[in-house]
C-alpha cells in the first residue's frame, strides 16, 4: 500500500518524532507489535493528512512517498476528521517529495482537502499567490492562517 509520511528535518537529515533517522530508498522494519498512535511506522493515504503528525507551520519538514510492505492496521481520528490513517511494521521510503511536488499536489486538491492543507502547511508568499482566488473560502483560510487576519471569519449581522 502506498501513502505519505512526514518527517522533521531536511532532505539530508530527517527523522520521525522519536528521533529515529530515515533515508530515501531504504526499508525499515520493527519487531514490536504495532498499535495505532503508539508503535510502528505511521503514514496516511493523503499527503495533507500527514501534516497532522508534524508541525509544518513551525518546523522544517520533509514529506515522503512511502510503501507499506508488512502488516497494516487502518485507523481514524473521527473527532478531528482524519481518516485513512495507517500503521505498519515494515515501510519503504520511496521518494522525498520536492516542494514543487507538494505544491503541485495541493493545487489539484478539491476544496475540502485544500482547506486542511492551507491550515497546516506554511507557505511562502509566492506559493500563497498560487492558491489565492481558487475559492472565497480558500482565500479566507489563507488570510486567517498565513496573514493572521483574525477577523476574516467574523460574520457581521445587520440589525432589524
PLM ranges: what are they?
Residues 1-160:
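Short, glycine-biased loop/turn motifs at secondary-structure junctions and
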